Amino acid sequence: MQKFFLVLSFFLIQTTIFSQSVDLEGKLKAQEEALKEKSKGEEKDTLSTDYYKIFYLDGRIDNVDTTLNIYKDYKFNFLREDSFDLISFANSAHTYNKLAYDFKDFSKPDIGARGKHFHYFEKEDIGYYNVPTPLTEIFAKSTYEQGQILDMLVSINLNPQYNFTIAHKGYKSLGKYINTRSRGNQFRFISNYESKNQLSSWKFHFVSQNIFNQENGGLDPDSIYFFEQASSYFVLDDFGNQIENEDGSFEMIEYDGYLDRSRLSPMLFAEGSLYSKRFFSDFKRVILKGKKDTFNTLALNYQFTHEYKKIQFNDPMNNKMFGEVLDFINDDQNVSDQNRFIEQENRLILSSNSNKLGKIQLSYSLTNWVNNFKIYENQDIGNSVFELNENQSNISFDWKKIFSKYTFELNFNKSSKDSFKSDFISLNIKGSPIKNLNFEIGSSIIEKSPNFNFKFYRSGFESYNWLNDNLHNEKISNINLKLSYKELLVLAADYN
């Protein structure tokens, strides 16, 4: 009996010890799992703004900037860029007086009316996004009087290869003066695709813009006098002479009503607008790619641009400040000029990127322009020209190479015909020999045709009708030097 009790006790003790060890191991494993889950929850998101990329047609790549600094304050305006060299008109979304002139303008001839294009989205201004998470950007600002500006952008990647962006800028401002109201809508749809093997990419955008401004031509002479003399005015007699008091002073009246700008009479009651739609497509295919070095590539691009613009000017009072109206415009009609412009371009680009030679790009483009004007009712056309249809082809060569701390750039373009040409050659050297101190020196020779409105224009005003067949091209030789310290100090000099 004692032996049986001892054996039974031995097995019971062993079973208890074994069960305790199993429970202890289970608790340890549970604690380890809990620690792992806790550590996962405490892991910080390592995603930074460097992953939010913006690509431009010229090859520039920017990161989305979410910092708050003094540079952002310089750009907190209607143009959303540093407007140091611009003097704005009396209301938002109007034109500007430009104090600095860029002599390195390599652009092709356009419709003209550059006063309407300060905040116009050109195809070079469109950025193509690639973001790991949905991105929203909102810019809002009040205007001078009874209005706001809202510019909103939403960018989403459906997958790592495809991104689409929708943006809209809307604004309205009454202004402080009579007949200076402005309003507009600028819609952008942007698409960016790149294949997984990075051999194919496609950039596309559609932009619709509607820019409207009332034009008052400035204040009339009486309004200028009353505004400058406020708030003390001389009292005149029936003959227009000043009334003299007994003490020898002239009688005056106090009235500050003309300090209210909304009561001052303007020179003009007219309206001007710019309406535009543009489709742009850029398809790229890498033909050759180095196995070891991704910089040794050879690629082919096809770019297509179709842009339509319509500029209108309406003067219901047929103001004489522009001269006499044409004979067929009677008292029941008003001047309502309309200019339509279509540009269509096809471009082929062969580009190479190698460590030894740098970036080389050779392109050929064919451009067609159609520029026509409105024909008024009862207008005798006769032999007058109301439409131009022009073609131009261009060959371009671009080279960029980085040597140590210095970057060399060479740009060349040659047009096939003299009319509406845009020939240029430019050499540029950039460098940063000292931290935060940058320099740029360059030279360029440009020969280009003026915009279409210098060569050809039709209007209801007699003095604004011309067709300049023998208009000379503009020739510019330029040497420029630029020194900058961060973005706080910029010194630039040009010799032409």
Stretch-by-stretch model annotation:
Residues 17-76, 80, 234-249:
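Sec-dependent signal peptide cleavage junction
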Residues 130-178, 182-187, 200:
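Outer-membrane beta-barrel translocator/receptor signature
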Residues 131-133, 269, 273-317, 331-496:
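Exposed, low-structure sequence patches enriched in small/polar residues
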Residues 143, 159, 167-173, 207-209, ...:
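An acidic- and aromatic-residue-enriched active-site/binding cleft used to recognize and process polar
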